[in-house]
Amino acid sequence: QQDYTGSHMDF
């Protein structure tokens, strides 16, 4: 399971 905010912090 992969977390979007954990792997891709582009906000």
From Swiss-Prot:
Pyrrolidone carboxylic acid sites (modified residues): 1
- Top-rank taxon of the source lineage equals Eukaryota
Q: How is it modified after translation?
A: Isoform 4.1Y4 differs from isoform 4.1 in not being sulfated.
- What is any one of the record's Gene Ontology cellular component terms? extracellular region
- According to the record, the segments passing through the membrane are none
Keyword terms, alphabetized: Amidation, Amphibian defense peptide, Hypotensive agent, Pyrrolidone carboxylic acid, Secreted, Sulfation
Q: Kindly list the positions at which Sulfotyrosine occurs in this protein.
A: 4
Keyword Secreted assigned: yes
As for subcellular location, the record says:
Secreted
Q: Which residues carry this modification: Phenylalanine amide?
A: 11
Query: What is the protein name for this chain?
Result: Caerulein-4.1/4.1Y4
The species is Ranoidea citropa
Which taxonomic lineage does the organism of this UniProt entry have? Eukaryota, Metazoa, Chordata, Craniata, Vertebrata
